[in-house]
């Protein structure tokens, strides 16, 4: 049986940060297990920007954030291995393409992979960092047939961004979580017609900035207080029935509306991935779907810690990293003899919501009533413009009053003022997409790319079209310029 001080299960942002933190805090025997063939977790398919503002101090795409997190782990191991530090060389072993089937309260791990088959691992401490999963159609109980073309937004994201498959031509998004909003924009950039985003609640579930840059920028209507009440089609989806709902979210008879479409993407919530937690006898919080935990993220089973979306769903990867750093430190201290805090696991784990991160607020709701293809709403002849700032996840509600210079209110920082003034005269955006790459064996793969800085919003489609027609040659590294003004955000 293999033995380690700490075993981290999951190689996404939480797992990478937890392993790094454990090494920094004196642990010299760490195993990081990832079921995929590469590290990074869900970040690898999240090619959009918006990551890293807190942890790295700059806006990154998901693959860039994953690359930086891995580089941080490697650099930490290298610096701690310096003989001048006087510390024992830390060892962080990584097992990819390895599936963990079960963990026990005694911290025995049962796993398997193609190389080693079935094997057991013993650990002094375990850090759970398995992330979360989407609610599928079965959990939503949508009536109707079971044709092709109905899938979660995350699955569609993988098909489009990783595999290069187009999932449909006429698309409806059910739910307004951030992944659904982001995929609405992504589908338009890939040539699909996104007919609507439908939300059962009276306000969107995603961040206000994503309402602006994913829906309003591309003329995609958002319908609130509505839901899908039937799915139609035999082999392929042919359409859906949409109904209004009352205050109890019950469909209202007589409000049905038919929409012809071939694809329905579900963005209706995330659930912590906790099958392993339950098998280990860890108490699960019914409010979060994740484990009860102490202030240092130790679960109800001594020596088993949890961090990231497996503990509770986060809005921002930066907050996942912050939480994982704490969990890694606590696990290292536990291994070195610190007392367990398992008896302090409570029903309200410490949450990092970010600084005023919020969904669309009531003061911004008027923007939904405007032409979604416009840059912002205005109050008649007064030329007062209302908009949501997209600079950071805070999503401030801005008002621009004409003058010389224009007066901007509602912003929390100077960047918001600059954004608002520019948004009226020359709106700018960053394009993120994928490009085909010819590998060394002659096969065609795909990597993520972005515009090298912001470009005029009206040039988004022309640049996207140019990228989609291009095949580049490998090798390509993160940060390489693959076309004039276009840089790679992942590598071959």
Predicted regions and their residues:
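FAD-binding core/adjacent interface of flavoenzyme oxidoreductases
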Residues: 1-9, 65-170, 247-254, 265, ...
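Predominantly flavin-linked oxidoreductase catalytic cores and closely associated redox partners
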Residues: 119, 125-222, 229-236, 311-312
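Active-site-proximal substrate-binding core of FAD-dependent oxidoreductases
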Residues: 312, 333-365, 379-382
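Signature of N-terminal electron-transfer/Fe-S-associated modules in redox systems
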Residues: 322, 383-472, 485
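Beta1-alpha1 glycine-rich phosphate/pyrophosphate-binding loop at the start
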Residues: 4-71, 168-210, 287
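A conserved FAD-binding loop/helix module that cradles the flavin
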Residues: 307-338
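A Rossmann-like FAD-binding core segment of flavoenzymes
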Residues: 68-80, 86-105, 109-111, 188-275, ...
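FAD-site-proximal beta/loop scaffold in flavoenzymes
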Residues: 128, 150-160, 263-314
């Amino acid at each position: 049986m293999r033995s380690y001080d700490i075993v981290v299960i999951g190689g996404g942002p939480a797992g990478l940060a937890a392993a790094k933190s454990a090494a920094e805090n004196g642990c010299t025997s760490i195993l990081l297990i990832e079921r995929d063939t590469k590290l990074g977790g869900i970040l690898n398919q999240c090619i959009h920007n918006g990551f890293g503002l807190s942890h790295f101090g700059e806006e990154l795409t998901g693959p860039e954030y994953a690359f930086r997190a891995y580089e941080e782990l490697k650099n930490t191991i290298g610096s701690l291995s310096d003989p001048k530090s006087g510390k024992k060389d830390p060892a962080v072993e990584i097992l990819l393409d390895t599936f963990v089937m079960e963990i026990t309260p005694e911290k025995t791990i049962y796993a398997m992979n193609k190389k080693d088959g079935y094997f057991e691992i013993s650990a002094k401490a375990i850090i759970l960092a398995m992330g979360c999963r989407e609610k599928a159609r079965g959990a939503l109980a949508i009536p109707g047939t079971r044709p092709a073309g109905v899938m979660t937004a995350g699955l569609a994201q993988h098909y489009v961004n990783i595999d290069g498959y187009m999932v449909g031509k006429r698309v409806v998004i059910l739910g307004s979580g951030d992944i659904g909003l982001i995929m609405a924009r992504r589908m338009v950039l890939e040539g699909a017609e996104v007919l609507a985003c439908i939300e059962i609640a009276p306000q969107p579930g995603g961040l206000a900035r994503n309402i602006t840059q994913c829906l309003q920028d591309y003329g995609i209507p958002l319908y609130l207080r509505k839901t899908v009440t039937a799915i139609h089609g035999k082999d392929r989806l042919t359409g859906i029935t949409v109904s209004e709902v009352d205050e109890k979210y019950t469909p209202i008879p007589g409000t049905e509306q038919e929409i012809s479409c071939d694809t329905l993407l579900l963005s209706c919530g995330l659930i912590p991935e906790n099958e392993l937690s339950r098998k280990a006898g860890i108490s699960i919080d019914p409010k979060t779907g994740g484990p009860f935990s102490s202030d240092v993220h130790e679960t109800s089973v001594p020596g088993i810690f949890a961090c990231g979306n497996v503990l509770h769903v986060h809005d921002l990867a930066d907050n996942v990293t912050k939480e994982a750093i704490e969990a890694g430190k606590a696990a290292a201290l536990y291994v070195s003899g610190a007392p367990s805090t398992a008896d302090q696991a409570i029903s309200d784990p410490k949450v990092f919501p970010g600084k005023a991160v919020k969904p669309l607020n009531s003061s911004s709701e008027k923007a939904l009533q405007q032409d979604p293809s416009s840059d912002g709403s205005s109050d008649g002849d007064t030329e007062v413009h209302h908009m949501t700032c997209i600079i950071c996840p805070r999503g401030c509600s801005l008002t621009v009053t004409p003058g010389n210079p224009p007066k901007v209110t509602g912003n929390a920082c100077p960047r918001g003022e600059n954004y608002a003034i520019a948004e009226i005269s020359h709106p700018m955006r960053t394009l993120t997409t994928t490009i085909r790459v010819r590998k060394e064996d002659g096969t065609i793969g795909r990597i993520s790319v972005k515009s090298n800085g912001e470009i005029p919003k009206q040039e988004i489609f022309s640049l996207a079209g140019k990228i989609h027609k291009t095949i580049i040659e490998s090798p390509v590294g993160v940060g390489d310029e693959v076309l004039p003004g276009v840089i790679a955000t992942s590598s071959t």
